[in-house]
């Protein structure tokens, strides 16, 4: 399986990581180059999306770096978006930006995505996981691209924002499978809704006979620790009890200190749940 970034917004480069302070006025711009300080003395950072200032409105929330930094939009002028820092934090290079509840008018498949997919097709990838699928049309565009390039690879739709939840059933019907990508989903939606969204997604996939993957933060603590938390064990157990077809690791095995132990742990929990189901039957 190969991940395809999809419509993603990121900050640009900054000379060095700096701390945003609560209550600070801060600007997002497009085309300003490396971040720094504007003529009015307000610190700023560039974004990679020219339509950024057109998609959002005064009062909207801007989340940076997986929601660790929160800002509120105060004013918009041309390509400049002025914000107030609500939750402070360190800002480094190329941090991911989330705009909860905002429809982002980026293409479903960017030029960079097409180049990445071409490499995947040449390598014989079986599945492409398309990030930030918003509606069935996004999948139709991707299916056509694969067909035009003589690929029979299947598409896994990653649901990661409110628009995807609204169009959930239609997205599942148009895809070859679904991934509940809980990282961005937990940022874009109220966190208390996340378990309900996961259950609804799994149940809908079962009804439509489509495979479903539950992913992200399965064993997050094991990036640094050799043992899982009790909450993580219960989370994995419940995902399998709800009849998810797959549970997937990410950061745990890419940057974690205990990648093999993570695989062994999640497998052990899955097998225990399956033995319990067999005993009940």
Predicted regions and their residues:
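Non-catalytic helical/linker scaffolds that mediate oligomerization, partner binding
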Residues: 1-281
């Amino acid at each position: 399986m190969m991940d395809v970034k999809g419509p993603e917004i990121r900050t640009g480069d900054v000379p060095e990581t700096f701390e945003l302070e609560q209550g600070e006025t801060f600007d997002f711009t497009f085309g300003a180059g490396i971040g720094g300080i504007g003529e009015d003395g307000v610190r700023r950072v560039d974004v990679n999306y020219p339509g950024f200032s057109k998609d959002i409105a005064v009062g909207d929330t801007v989340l940076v770096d997986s929601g660790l930094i929160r800002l509120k939009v105060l004013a918009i002028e041309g390509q400049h978006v002025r914000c107030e820092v609500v939750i402070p934090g360190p800002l480094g290079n190329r941090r991911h930006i989330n705009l909860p509840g905002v429809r982002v008018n980026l293409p479903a498949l960017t030029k960079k995505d097409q180049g990445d997919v071409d490499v995947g097709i040449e390598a014989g990838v079986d599945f492409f996981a398309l990030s930030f699928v918003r509606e069935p049309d996004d999948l139709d565009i991707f299916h056509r691209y694969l067909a035009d390039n003589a690929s029979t690879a299947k598409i896994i739709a990653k649901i990661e924002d409110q628009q995807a939840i609204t169009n959930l059933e239609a997205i599942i019907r148009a895809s070859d499978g679904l991934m509940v990508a809980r990282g961005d989903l937990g940022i874009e939606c109220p966190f208390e809704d996340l378990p309900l969204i996961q259950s609804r997604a799994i149940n809908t996939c079962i009804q439509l006979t489509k495979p479903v993957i539950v992913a992200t933060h399965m064993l997050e603590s094991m990036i640094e620790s050799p043992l899982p938390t009790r909450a993580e064990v219960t989370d994995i157990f419940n995902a399998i009890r709800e009849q998810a077809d797959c549970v997937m690791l990410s950061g745990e095995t890419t940057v974690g200190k205990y990648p093999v132990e993570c695989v062994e742990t999640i497998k052990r929990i899955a097998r225990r749940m399956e033995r319990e189901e067999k005993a009940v039957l």
